Amino acid sequence: MSQKETRIPTWAWVHALSLEAPLVAVLWQLVLAEAHRIRLLPGVIVGLGLVVWLVYVVDRLLDGMGTNPDSLDVRHAFYARNRRLISWVALPLMAGLLAWVGLCSIPEGMLWQSLALALLVVIYLGSYAARQHRRWLGLVGAFAGLGSVLVVLELPISNGVKLQLAGVGMLMMILGFFQRIEKGRKRGFPKEFLGGLLFALGTSMGIQFFAFGDGAVMLSLDALLLWGLFTLNLIGISCVESAAGAGDAESVPAQWPWLGRQYAWLLSLFTVVTAVACVRPDQAWAGNRLLPMAVLASLLLHGLVWIFRSRCTPLSYRVLTDLALVLPTVWVLLS
């Protein structure tokens, strides 16, 4: 399928509406809940789905800002052509519903942690979204990002969580903003690593709060394992898009092409590490192999899709890799 086609295939509407990301986040959250034997409040599940959906919608709106829809892929073109409806109707409704869920259904401590993570997501969007306006957004965002980090340090959450989130925020500012505003710079920090990290932190936050309280360590083994999985998912997609001539300038193939060429080895190495975690789970897993087994199954499916990538378009590859994320969770939850 050409990148300039405007018709969205029936099987791709989930992606066009950005529903794949909240689905993946919620399913892996439920797997974590099963692994830790935690019964989540409905508001926590709905809240995660809503916030991930909102972030992805905003990201795609910003990516298409100031760009001719005919030059975008079908996913971003959909948002560019329906910008007003989405901006003035869909986004306010989603934000209002999310605020109601957050204020009425989520414990206060978790709400503050979510707010801290949301500020880091804003830094990420300022760093990597809005393709046509990244330079001036970098200048403005550097100061806004610093303010966000200072706000995180003042929130009523544990010092350990504060320091970890503030550290991630500072890293994102340095690698995301400051490297971009240098005119003519061709090497920055790829977005996949930070995007995968934020997605993993958001997915695991609710479980860690109920399992360990508001003093939870954000970068737990659960979060690190999911970080690796989600990052490899994003890098694989970027590699396929780059090979088709449709890659992003902030992706691994563009910034670190040497690493993109080693994707199969990266995937294999992390698969081996995860397999070891399944055989000999650390004490921090409490002897529960459920999460590493689900991650291992997903990695194996990713490897299978990668082998047949030459038969895929960038869009169909996205769909298949998202299925590689979804199917193991369904297996765990139904078994």
Name every feature range the model reports, one short phrase each.
Residues 140-143, 250-262, 300-328:
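Interfacial loop-to-transmembrane junctions
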Residues 134-141, 186-197, 255-263:
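Cytoplasm-facing juxtamembrane segments at the starts of transmembrane helices
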Residues 56-92, 227-269:
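Solvent-exposed interhelical
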Residues 56-69, 122-133, 174-191, 234-246, ...:
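C-terminal ends of transmembrane helices
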Residues 2-5, 9-55, 69-70, 88-124, ...:
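Hydrophobic alpha-helical transmembrane segments
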